């Protein structure tokens, strides 16, 4: 089974953009680690990143149609996109919302998520290890049949 790991705007700059907030690990580093983890768990992961909201919506629609579980770091769209929330509501195989930083300890506007109410779970503030936790959780549901 495949788990999609989808990343929103500015995450292509992970490791370079505000390393004091997001750390020094790049998205390529995260992908390499998740590929190893997926092999251990007996699942496949596919990591994608886009700064274009319409592209993200298309990926989520495709995942919903294919019945795939999704790890999503919506980044700034977390706080702004009803369209993203509505697309995510169609995901039936599981959705874990991930944030590298603790969005609840930052500016007020970052504390609201349009995605959280339709997510299976949320991981925030654990750095890039949040991706690992999300993949482990979804793999357990897939392999365990939950």
Swiss-Prot record:
Pathway terms, separated by semicolons: Metabolic intermediate biosynthesis; chorismate biosynthesis; chorismate from D-erythrose 4-phosphate and phosphoenolpyruvate: step 3/7
Keywords of the record: Amino-acid biosynthesis, Aromatic amino acid biosynthesis, Lyase
Gene3D superfamilies attached to this UniProt entry: Dehydroquinase, class II
Entry coiled-coil feature ranges: none
Enzyme class: lyase
GO terms for biological process, alphabetical: amino acid biosynthetic process; aromatic amino acid family biosynthetic process; chorismate biosynthetic process; quinate catabolic process
Keyword match Transmembrane: no
Function, as annotated: Catalyzes a trans-dehydration via an enolate intermediate.
HAMAP family listed in its UniProt record: AroQ (MF_00169)
UniProt xrefs under NCBIfam families: aroQ, PRK05395.1-2, PRK05395.1-3, PRK05395.1-4
Protein family (similarity comment): Belongs to the type-II 3-dehydroquinase family.
Name this protein carries in UniProt: 3-dehydroquinate dehydratase
Organism: Kineococcus radiotolerans (strain ATCC BAA-149 / DSM 14245 / SRS30216)
Organismal lineage: Bacteria, Bacillati, Actinomycetota, Actinomycetes, Kineosporiales
Gene transcribed to yield this protein: aroQ
């Amino acid at each position: 089974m495949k788990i999609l790991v989808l990343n929103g705007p500015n995450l292509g700059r992970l490791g370079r953009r505000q390393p004091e907030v997001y750390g020094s690990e790049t998205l390529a580093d995260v992908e390499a680690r998740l590929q190893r983890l997926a092999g251990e768990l007996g699942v496949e992961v596919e990591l994608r990143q886009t700064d274009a909201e319409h592209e993200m919506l298309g990926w989520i629609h495709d995942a919903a149609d294919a019945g795939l579980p999704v790890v999503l770091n919506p980044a700034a769209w977390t706080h702004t996109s009803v369209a993203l929330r509505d697309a995510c509501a169609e995901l039936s195989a599981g959705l874990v919302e991930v944030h590298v930083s603790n969005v609840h300890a930052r500016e007020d506007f970052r504390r609201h998520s349009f995605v959280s109410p339709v997510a299976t779970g949320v991981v925030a503030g654990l750095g890039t290890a949040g991706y690992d936790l999300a993949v482990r959780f979804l793999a357990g549901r897939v392999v365990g049949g939950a």
